[in-house]
Amino acid sequence: MVNVPTAVWIDERGRIVRPNEVAFIDDRFKTFTGMDSAPYIDAIRDWAAKGAKSVYALSEAELKARLKPRSDERSRADAEFALAEYLYKQGKGADAIPHFKEAQRLDPDNWNYKRQAWALSDAERDYGTSFGKEVKKLNGKPYYEPRKLPAAVARP
């Protein structure tokens, strides 16, 4: 998951029917992201009403095509991040920083790693950056991957 708010749709059988994607339920971030919340809300309502027959519920083949394989770097990043969190919770914040940095290096697109680390210390001092600076570095690249929803379904 890139950042909050994201969601994974899981049906009553425990099966994932949509992978993680940005999940705005209102338009408070529309000027920042350019994403309208209405199509996503309509999709949720359609799925809630129609279940597996909803055009928004993905088949197993569609789901597999969208899921990204887990790389060795991502697995190592998860381990580094977990170690950093552990050290921080043990009162060893300074010892955690190199592990937070390594997690970010190994999985540079993971904003969860960045934002968590920056919130636990002085981001400018310890990481030489801030959330605002990193967003500016995107230089127009979407912060959130655009949703892949089918064309709007006519309302009854």
Residue ranges of model-derived segments:
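Boundary/linker segments of alpha-helical solenoid repeat arrays
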Residues: T31, P108-Q116, G128
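Long, low-complexity intrinsically disordered regions enriched in Ser/Thr, Asp/Glu, Pro/Gly
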Residues: D122, V153-P156
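Alpha-helical linker/edge segments of TPR/alpha-solenoid repeat scaffolds
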Residues: L120-L149
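Thiol-/selenol-based redox modules, centered on thioredoxin-like
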Residues: N3-K92, S121
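Short coil turns that delineate tetratricopeptide repeat
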Residues: R74, L106-P108
